[in-house]
């Protein structure tokens, strides 16, 4: 007979505690709805689900960012819609002024309206903003101009049509074998490239000086056969091609549309009257005081309408892309949420069954403990 230990009571007590703890854990899971409430429940599962939660939160915020970006684009596009309406009105006035049935007084009145409309274009460009950020004043173009860059080319010709070069910029000097000449204009770039490696000469955008069906050029003692038309720039000796006398650094809008690092740059050109071509550099609006000037103004206004249309098309493309981005982010977030749920969320039916089992076992163990304590040792 054993008198120091009641083994049956100890066994019943141990099982009762185990079942009670299991029932308590099951109740915690049922009350929280989570299978993992602490790292001890599933250490690996907790680590995986936390990474997923971070990505899900990032995707949801990226979707919100994309929505904000669309709102910004809609703000800019709405302002440009009004700019378009103003330009259409200005074109109508220019067409009206080009008719000689109008007197000088009539054209003066028309000019006054054109002046006011031009001022309104500038006001829209200077005041349109989203969350205090200017959108149409040229501060969101995303381009950087060079600083004080002078490019000089010296062309010497002889009977053999030979070419000598002396080219320098702030970044490169003394280019002996090859060089590239670039002329930057308001709406584009025309370039001429000379290369000594294969001795091809490509000249684009210059003034036509020579035209032959075929000719021969000598460059560095090697012959170049050109068939067709030869075009080159009309450049005086040591003529300066381009000089940029200022620095203008502007920044495009960077949109964070991904959970990690996915930036989208949105550039918006200046929509000021001068930049779209309906105000000259001296600050005067288009002159429609005569029929001939009004006719010329129509062409300038047409170009301005095309410029604004191009910018609105870009904004529309940005918006369409962002809408697809939002759809993709939503799908990704939904799939990751489903995966995270399978790891972390509790199966209510299964856990309820587990709780009922452990609760019954705990009650049974408690009853058996009472019986064991009454047994003869």
From Swiss-Prot:
Stored SUPFAM superfamilies: Phase 1 flagellin (SSF64518)
Pfam entry (one): Flagellin_N
UniProt GO MF annotations: structural molecule activity
Compartment list: Secreted; Bacterial flagellum
Gene Ontology cellular-component terms listed: bacterial-type flagellum; extracellular region
Keyword RNA-binding appears in the UniProt entry: no
Source taxon at top rank: Bacteria
Function, as annotated: Flagellin is the subunit protein which polymerizes to form the filaments of bacterial flagella.
PANTHER family recorded: FLAGELLIN (PTHR42792:SF2)
Stated name of the protein: Flagellin
The organism of origin for this protein: Clostridium tyrobutyricum
């Amino acid at each position: 007979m054993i008198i120091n230990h009641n083994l049956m009571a100890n066994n019943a007590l141990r099982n009762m505690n185990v079942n009670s703890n299991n029932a308590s854990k099951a109740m915690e899971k049922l009350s929280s709805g989570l299978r993992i409430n602490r790292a001890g429940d599933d250490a690996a599962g907790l680590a995986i689900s936390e990474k997923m939660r971070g990505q899900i939160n990032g995707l949801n915020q990226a979707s919100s960012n994309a929505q904000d970006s669309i709102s910004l684009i809609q703000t800019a596009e709405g302002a440009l819609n009004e700019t378009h309406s103003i330009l259409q009105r200005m074109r109508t006035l220019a067409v009206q002024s080009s008719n000689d049935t109008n007197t000088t007084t009539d054209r003066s009145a028309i000019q006054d309206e054109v002046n006011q409309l031009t001022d309104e274009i500038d006001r829209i460009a200077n005041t349109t903003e989203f969350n205090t950020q200017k959108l149409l004043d040229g501060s969101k173009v995303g381009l950087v101009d060079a600083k004080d860059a002078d490019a000089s080319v010296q062309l010497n010709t002889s009977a053999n049509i030979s070419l000598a070069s002396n080219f320098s910029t702030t970044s490169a000097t003394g280019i002996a074998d090859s060089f590239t000449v670039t002329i930057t204009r308001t709406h584009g770039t025309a370039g001429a490239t000379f290369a000594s490696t294969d001795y091809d000469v490509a000249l684009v955008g210059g003034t036509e000086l020579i035209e032959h069906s075929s000719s021969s050029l000598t460059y560095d003692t090697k012959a170049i056969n050109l068939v067709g038309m030869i075009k080159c720039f009309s450049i005086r000796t040591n003529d300066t091609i381009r000089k940029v006398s200022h620095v203008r650094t502007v920044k495009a809008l960077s949109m964070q549309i991904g959970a990690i690092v996915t930036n989208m740059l949105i550039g918006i050109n200046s929509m000021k009257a001068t930049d779209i071509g309906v105000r000259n550099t001296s600050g005067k609006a288009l002159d429609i005081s005569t029929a001939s000037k009004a006719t010329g103004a129509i062409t300038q206004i047409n170009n301005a309408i095309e410029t604004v249309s191009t910018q609105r098309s870009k904004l529309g493309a940005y918006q369409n892309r962002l809408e697809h981005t939002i759809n993709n982010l939503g799908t990704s977030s939904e799939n990751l949420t489903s995966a995270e749920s399978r790891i972390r969320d509790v199966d209510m039916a299964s856990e309820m069954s587990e709780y009922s089992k452990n609760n019954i076992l705990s009650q049974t163990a408690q009853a058996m403990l009472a019986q064991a304590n009454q047994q003869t040792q």
